[in-house]
């Protein structure tokens, strides 16, 4: 298990790697990766934290667990690798973006552009077995990603948390610092998007908050590849 985070998350999260829960998780993952197909690739597990440093995090979009189909997951919530069909929830995110800003829906679901601007695309569970959603639930990742949220909660500079759906909203209890902002609605999944995701304007809400803070706004437009 690669556990060296090369930016400022490294020292902040170093104590987690020594804890009993993480040792058990690492043993479990070693076994899983050697006996099953697991996503994402080992070197991509911590991509959300690698792309978006602690200091540079402006926004957090919380997901659940990685996509479990071939070549989809690469360590960023909701994002898929280039050349892979855009999944339904992300397509609905793009439709809302089109309605807010008039952007064309891109031909890909590769969200690295967001991550590089300070949007932490964090799943609460960072690995999954091929074809088995939630197969790595309850193995220790939740402790680790809760710590990520707690560390952001401790930060002086405000963070905007986007919580879509009940799973993400359950993490509200970790966000106790009133400096931070929470934007929430139902999940963009086709099962729920029409019950309050469409029309919720999360992207422009984020940029209004950032502008009021004197911060650079997020350019949400994803280019075609």
Curated annotation (Swiss-Prot):
The alphabetical list of record keywords is: Cytoplasm, DNA damage, DNA repair, Hydrolase
Q: How is this protein annotated for GO cellular component?
A: cytoplasm
Reaction catalysed by this chain? Hydrolyzes single-stranded DNA or mismatched double-stranded DNA and polynucleotides, releasing free uracil
An example of a Pfam family matching this protein is UDG
Task: Specify the domain of life of the species encoding this protein.
Answer: Bacteria
Q: Where in the cell is it found?
A: Cytoplasm
Q: What is its main location?
A: cytoplasm
- The active site of this protein is located at 65 (proton acceptor)
Which CDD domains does the record match to this protein? Answer: UDG-F1-like (cd10027)
Q: What is this protein called?
A: Uracil-DNA glycosylase
Report the source organism.
Bacillus cereus (strain ZK / E33L)
Specify the taxonomic lineage: Bacteria, Bacillati, Bacillota, Bacilli, Bacillales
